[in-house]
Amino acid sequence: MAKKGFPGMGGAPNMNNMMKQVQKMQKDMEKTQAALEEKEVEASAGGGAITVKVSGKKEVISIEIKPEVVDPEDVEMLQDLIMAAVNEAMRGAEEMVSKEMGKVTGGMNIPGLF
């Protein structure tokens, strides 16, 4: 009588365990993603002149600009500061998401997951 399951996989009981592990990982990932949606990353540029908050969903939540940095004669500097703060906050959010999801996936990089 032939063994059930895939060749080299040790039969059906091991496949059942693998499926349970995958289902547990999926649930853990969903919980982690929900928790990440509630977290925020903050970054600033220009010595705190511009402050940006980004969510765990990698969406900009807020941008704060100190009035003293608003110079109609130098809009380009303000644009550069905003861009720097947004990019830094996005990098921070990406690192936070990768770290938290890495705990769930055991460090496996699953494309398109987060």
UniProtKB/Swiss-Prot annotation:
Q: Which UniProt keywords apply?
A: Cytoplasm, DNA-binding
Key word DNA damage present in the record? no
| Pfam families in the cross-refs | YbaB_DNA_bd
Single GO molecular-function term?
DNA binding
* Location of this chain's protein in the cell: Cytoplasm, Nucleoid
Checking NCBIfam families in the record gives: DNA_YbaB_EbfC (TIGR00103)
Q: How does it assemble?
A: Homodimer.
Recorded protein name is Nucleoid-associated protein Amet_4780
The upper taxonomy is: Bacteria, Bacillati, Bacillota, Clostridia, Peptostreptococcales
